[in-house]
């Protein structure tokens, strides 16, 4: 992260997020996010972000805390490139699905959510879908599979006029995008 010259931490609503690193030097990945497996003991936190103490200079680092199903899914899609663990688009998509569903549920429960984040995660699924290798099949289980099914159900219920994929320059409309998701994950 230091070598790549990344900026760390971004603000969303009231909270700073120190698990996402962006704007690295040319030749480095566009973004780095830190993930951690849920520990086998109770944590006194409500949300899925856990602080990580490294040293006194890095007191605000955090990681996205994953349940066992998402951790196993992430590890099953992990590839090492130049000594760095990375995920392909096909394994990132279910994380974006989960993020959208989570925000949608919070909004429906009356909680304030950032509409830009809600829209971003919805479209990130389709943006990433464009770069998934044709014909690939991805296996999942548990909560990951539930999220995939739920995303497909929810996004299929949204009026297609509200999902302007072709106008955004994507090579498919919502219905074709949903078909591709089913071919990959179901």
Give short role names for the model-derived ranges.
Residues 1-186:
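Compositionally biased terminal segments of proteins
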């Amino acid at each position: 992260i230091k070598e790549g010259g990344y900026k760390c931490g971004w603000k969303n609503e009231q909270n700073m997020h120190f698990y996402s690193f962006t704007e690295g030097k040319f030749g480095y990945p566009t973004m780095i996010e830190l993930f951690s497996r849920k520990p086998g003991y109770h944590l006194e936190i409500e949300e899925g972000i856990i602080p990580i103490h490294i040293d006194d200079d890095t007191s605000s680092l955090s990681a996205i805390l994953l349940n066992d199903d998402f951790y196993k899914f992430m590890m099953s899609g992990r590839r090492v490139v130049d000594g760095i663990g990375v995920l392909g688009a096909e394994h990132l998509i279910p994380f974006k699905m989960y993020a959208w569903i989570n925000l949608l549920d919070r909004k429906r429960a009356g909680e304030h959510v950032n509409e830009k984040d809600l829209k971003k995660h919805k479209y990130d699924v389709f943006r990433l879908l464009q770069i998934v290798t044709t014909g690939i099949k991805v296996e999942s289980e548990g909560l990951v599979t539930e999220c995939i099914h739920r995303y497909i159900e929810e996004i299929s219920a949204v009026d297609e006029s509200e999902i302007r994929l072709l106008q955004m320059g994507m090579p498919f409309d919502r219905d074709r995008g949903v078909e591709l998701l089913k071919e990959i994950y179901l």
